[in-house]
Regions:
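Cysteine-cluster motifs in flexible loop/terminal segments that predominantly coordinate metals
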Residues: 36-48, 173-213
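Short alpha-helical "patches" and their helix-cap loops
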Residues: 60, 135-141, 200-208
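Nucleic-acid nuclease catalytic cores
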Residues: 81-172, 191
Length: 213
C-alpha cells in the first residue's frame, strides 16, 4: 500500500536526482582543470570534495535554480579560461545580448550581492570574454532583485590565485586554512574543521574540574 512506502526516502532520492541533473559537472580527478564554483566558495570544502568527499544531506537550491535557467533557450554552455599549465572552467546560467547572468534563490533579498556570487559572475565575464553581467536573486514568492557588475581584473586575479592554491594543496594533500562563514554550520565537513577544537575545550574543562576535585 502507498501508506507503507518510505516517502522520506522517495523525496530524498528525487532531490538527489535533480541535484545531479542540474548541478555543475566537475571532474574531481583532474587537478589540471578547476571549476569556478570550487574557488569562489570555501577552498577547504572544495579540497575535501576532491580528496575525501561526503555527500551533503542538504540540497542547495540557491545553486540549483541556476541550473534550471541553463536548460532554457538562452542557457549557456560551459567554457574554459586557459591558464597555460591548467584551465579554469565556468558556466554562466544565461547569456543574452552579451550580458552574462547568474540566478540564485534566497529567502530574503540581500542589501548587497553575496561575495561568492560577485566572484563567480566576474569570473564568468572573463571566461566568456564579456564586459557586463547581472546577478539575479529570486525569493520564494517569485519576486526578483538584481545587481549589475562590470568586469574587474583585480577580482579575477584573486580567483586565479585561489585556483593555483587549490591545485597545489590537492596535489600535496594539505587541507587549506579555515575560511569561517555562515555556511559552516550546515557544511558536511563541519566536524573535520571544528571538532578537534571542541574536544580540546572539553578536555581542558575536564582537567579543571578534576583539579578542583
Amino acid at each position: 500500500m502507498m501508506g507503507d512506502r518510505n516517502f522520506r526516502t522517495v523525496i530524498t532520492s528525487a532531490i538527489e536526482s535533480v541535484s545531479k541533473q542540474l548541478d555543475y559537472k566537475i571532474d574531481t580527478e583532474n587537478i589540471d582543470k578547476i571549476h569556478l564554483s570550487e574557488v569562489t566558495k570555501c577552498l577547504r570544502r572544495s579540497y575535501f570534495d576532491r580528496t575525501d568527499p561526503i555527500e551533503s544531506e542538504i540540497a542547495h537550491f540557491s545553486d540549483l535554480v541556476g541550473g534550471m535557467f541553463r536548460q532554457l533557450e538562452y542557457g549557456s554552455a560551459p567554457a574554459e579560461y586557459d591558464l597555460k599549465n591548467m584551465k579554469l572552467e565556468g558556466q554562466a546560467d544565461m547569456i543574452a545580448d552579451d550580458v552574462v547572468m547568474i540566478f540564485r534563490s534566497v529567502s530574503e533579498f540581500p542589501e548587497d550581492p553575496h561575495a561568492k556570487d560577485i566572484l563567480y559572475l566576474n569570473g564568468c565575464l572573463w571566461i566568456y570574454g564579456e564586459t557586463n553581467g547581472i546577478i539575479v536573486y529570486i525569493n520564494g514568492d517569485g519576486k526578483e532583485a538584481s545587481f549589475s557588475l562590470t568586469k574587474n581584473k583585480k577580482m579575477f586575479e584573486e580567483v586565479i590565485r585561489r585556483v593555483r592554491v587549490l591545485k597545489d594543496l590537492v596535489k600535496e594533500k594539505k587541507p587549506p586554512i579555515l575560511e569561517p562563514s555562515t555556511e559552516c554550520s550546515t557544511c558536511q565537513y563541519y566536524e573535520r574543521c571544528f571538532s578537534k577544537k571542541k574536544r580540546n575545550e572539553k578536555d581542558l574543562i575536564a582537567q579543571i574540574i578534576g583539579q578542583r576535585v
